[in-house]
């Protein structure tokens, strides 16, 4: 009788340990998935991405006028997807606009093909360029929309969920 009681208690103890272990594993797995559900890209981080893009776009543009973002949309899933419309403003581009601009970034690449420009920015950081950004904020858009050069840019934000930051951003711009 003693052997059967000890065997039953041993099996019961193993069963209880198994239940605790499986519950803890399921809880840990669920918590890991919550990282992907949480949108940590707030408006300030997205504004920094837009500012970096406006700086790069205007720096590498051969146009004599500055361009700014007219319309924007952004959706966050596992990656962030968005669309912006770059439109020419009435403000002329001059070299002093980019004076004392501090662009903090790890790496960026620019690739041009007819009708498309691709900007890839790794660790976008931010851009410190008060003069250019304040000028863009105060520049009205060109009003003659039928003659307006527009570019639609689709972008993907590649987040770093561990660091709760943006790892890279890729913009693909197409002339309309």
Swiss-Prot record:
Please give the superkingdom of this protein's source: Eukaryota
Q: Which GO terms describe its molecular function?
A: cysteine-type endopeptidase inhibitor activity
Q: Which UniProt keywords apply?
A: Cleavage on pair of basic residues, Disulfide bond, Glycoprotein, Protease inhibitor, Signal, Thiol protease inhibitor
| One Gene Ontology cellular component annotation held by this UniProt entry | extracellular space
**Position of the signal peptide:** 1-26
The organs and tissues expressing this protein are described as: Prostate and lacrimal gland.
Q: List the disulfide bonds.
A: 129-139, 153-173
Q: Which residues are glycosylated?
A: 71
Among SUPFAM superfamilies, the record links this protein to: Cystatin/monellin (SSF54403)
Which GO BP terms, alphabetically?
androgen receptor signaling pathway; cellular response to dexamethasone stimulus; cellular response to testosterone stimulus; detection of chemical stimulus involved in sensory perception of bitter taste; negative regulation of proteolysis; response to testosterone
What does its record list under induction? By androgens.
Q: Which InterPro entries match?
A: Cystatin_dom, Cystatin_sf
Positions of the pro-segment in this chain: 27-31
Keyword Oxidoreductase, does the record have it? no
| Protein's UniProt keywords contain Disulfide bond | yes
Please state which protein family the record places this protein in. Answer: Belongs to the cystatin family.
Q: Which PANTHER family match?
A: CYSTATIN (PTHR46186), CYSTATIN 10 (PTHR46186:SF4)
This protein is called Cystatin-related protein 1
